[in-house]
Amino acid sequence: MKFGKKLRFECVSEWHNKYISYGKLKKYLRYLYRSDLKQIGEAEEAHLLINGFPSLSDSQEQFKQLSNSSSPIFNDGSCLENSLDSSIGSNIIQEQSQHQQQAQQQPPQQAQQQPPQQAQQQAQQQAPQAQQQAQQQAQQPEQQQQQDLKESFNDITGYSIDQYEDTSNLDEKTPLISILDQSRPTTTTTTTTTTMNTSAGSGIFKNKKPKQIPTISIPVFSQSERERLFLSKIDEELRKINEFFSNKEKDIILHYNKLTEHCSLILKDRNPSPKVLKNIQKAFGELYKGLTMLENYVNLNYQGFEKILKKYDRLAPMNSSIKLDQMERIKLEKFHSSKSWRNMKEDVELLYCKIFKLDKISIAKKKLAPFSESQSADYHMLKLGFAIGLSIGILAFVIILFTNKSLNQHPDWTRFVSTIPIFRAVGIPILAVWLWGVNVYIWDNARVNYILIFGLDPRTSIDHRRIWKTASFLTAIWLTMFLLFCGTVTGNFALGDVPAQVYPLVLVIFFLSVVFFPFRFFHRKSRTLLFITLGNVIITPFGSTKFRALFLGDLLTSMVKTIFDFEYTACYFFTGDWMINDSTRCNQVNSIALPILSGLPLLWRFMQCILRYRETNNKIHLGNSTKYAVGFSVVLFSALNGNYQAYEPWSASRILWCVCFVLSTLYMYCWDVVVDWGFMWLGKPRPLLRHQLMYKRHMWSYYYVLFSNLILRFAWTLTITRIPFELPINSELFNTITASIELVRRFTWSIFRVENEHICNSIQYHAFDFSEAPWKNEVPKVESPKSLLPLSSSYPYRQDNFNNNNNNNNNNNNNNNNNNNNNNNNNNNNNNNNNNNNNNNNNNNNTNNNINNINNINNNNNNSPSGSNSSINNSFHLGSSSYSYDNQYSIWKKSSKQYYSTSLIDSIKKKFFNNNNSNNNKK
């Protein structure tokens, strides 16, 4: 895989603007070293103007004005005829200049013997000779002359003239820029050339006259200038990467410090609550995810610099390689030389083992891995193909059953119509699973981080293949039950003596068991998260307002018919109507329940918007709540006008209902387009769209959704109201069609809604979420490096320092006043041990919180036994260890807290490795 594609698919999508601009650097190298230039983009031409070089657009405009309109003209303003004439004329001028140079480069003795008059006469004699040679060249045979013209055209332009002999190819974008030899300085001048008369012999262009043409040229740099310009680009990329890396590293350090503090409290508590452990486990996962992303950021940028420098060495002349020197310099840059994030990653693994009582670091790495290692894609695709094939076969039987008149003799349409809502109540959620898989597939291909947006666990989230596999099996079961029911109702076939009304009941029981039973199949963790989110929506004033809860609330507003069908299903089976084949009572109940059930999702979303406004104080949520209030008014007027028939005259309330119907639809459409999708930017380069798009390869989809959403919004309004007009088809079939269309519209809406949310996260470079961490209200946002103060402290032990622990302790005990112990005590409870340390001259009183006094801890020791394995070094500077957090800490960070946190990590490391060594010795 090429590195450009690798960078596009492996980078953190929210940080893509902060990675190395590999594509732009490749274009810039192509500009510096290649003569057959393609069209130079706006960024490259702007760079030329900034550096004081002439722009190509001015020369092209002059060339268009002077070129003949009857000649074949290319898109960049150049003319084929003029280019050929200029090439031939330039060849003649070069020959003349060569003769003059030969005349001037004669031996010095002859030049001294010849008087000036003779030298001038000799030069005048050589000039006609050059003209005679040009005439002889013009009198060559026609085929040879055409071949010479083609060769001269190819040498200058880099393009073959054969592709231009056909006039159909003249409309293609083939720029023609005359470029001077790289060994000479270039100038943009207008020269008069003496061209040969092509009407005599050339079969390509006839009756062409010599004319004054401009020579378009671009700057040709020397090797030193090329190297200087390229290295300036490299320096710009390094500054961008180092600045972003520093900010993200500081942000991770803040959360790392808070994590160690809370872990120390958990270790003190012998029986922490499950909720605390769950929250701290999520915090561990997010911190490890951030460290993994930072590692990915460093590795990809380093590979990018290595690749682009390799390309530079390939294009540059011999003996001008800069790759080795520059890579040594890049290794010393902050983003690559920093060891803080590497050491933190090791410490997080050890701390996770201690908190959750794991024996091996490999187990902790597996649990902390940000992405799960699922089964192979081929395995899931095999199951998916089997289930889809089974579903297609059953669907074919259903179609034959309804289309073949010889089979459909005596159908029981009353029973069939009464059970349509039951099959629809199960079928619409299955369709939603299919559409969710389509959305996940689109987001994955477009690199939209939906996992972060919905707050999912990347270790347990399921991809589109597994979603489609589950949906295909559910579809096969649904079609099987529907086929058996239809065969029994029509009297064509039956499964023994089983009555037709049993099949809908079996389908409902199976569906509920799959959804609610806590078995380890059908993605139990995903189902659990779905029910938790659904509970938050139902108890909205007291629930969560995360994005997934808001998204599920919007989805429920589109599944009003499904909610209504579940109510009908419960009534149909609990009242016993399915035994007597009578749905009269349930229909009467539905006339009352429909307005209530239709308004519940709108009421939930309305309260969610009010709660969001209370939390964020953002007035845009009030506008969103108004949207749902208007929709609720449509439901209210529909309930008041539900008894009207199509032939009855229109009353004032009915007219008001229609007005609310239209206004609510238009209001919701405008809100979808402007706020939820972020469209309607009136300007270039994309009218009616936003500046940044994630689905650029399918630009038509944006304009399609702008049009289709307006039409399908009216279909949604029909799903929450009664239909006060007659229909040419059965009402249950019409409800099924409108419910399916509305569900498709909602999931189409979600594709662009999540895209807009992802772009908002990308603007803030928000790639990991600590919103559920125990310290979510304690850590300030890292806006700029100015909010951080330097703290001269080094990072504690690495794993390779444990074998030399005694040597490190001896190096740190040079300033003791009384005792030379091999180990130090690095606890935050130094004041509690003052009564037992009478020989230390009150060394343990250094528990002040001043940042500048942290280093004084290196001079203090306790009277612990010198050979104790459980002793902990209290020094931050451990011998030759130079692993530091780059001396950057937050202003709110207390020195005593950091002192305790590092001692906690040290103690965990020492105990962990001592236990491992003892186990190895026993073996």
UniProtKB/Swiss-Prot annotation:
Record keyword Transmembrane present: yes
Region: Disordered, residue numbers: 94-150, 185-208, 793-871
Annotated CDD domains: SPX
InterPro entries given in the database record: EXS_C (IPR004342), SPX_dom (IPR004331)
Residue ranges annotated for the SPX domain, each copy included: 1-326
Top-rank lineage group of the source organism: Eukaryota
Family matches, as Pfam families: EXS, SPX
Classification via PANTHER family: PROTEIN ERD1 HOMOLOG 2 (PTHR10783:SF46), XENOTROPIC AND POLYTROPIC RETROVIRUS RECEPTOR 1-RELATED (PTHR10783)
Keywords: Membrane, Transmembrane, Transmembrane helix
Residues annotated as domain EXS: 585-785
Protein name: SPX and EXS domain-containing protein 1
GO cellular component: membrane; trans-Golgi network
Segments traversing the membrane: 382-402, 416-436, 471-491, 499-519, 529-551, 591-611, 620-640, 655-675, 700-720
Main location: membrane
Composition skew (Low complexity), residue ranges: 94-147, 186-195
Family of the protein in this entry: Belongs to the SYG1 (TC 2.A.94) family.
Keyword hit for Transmembrane helix: yes
Topology in the lipid bilayer: Multi-pass membrane protein
Compartments where found: Membrane
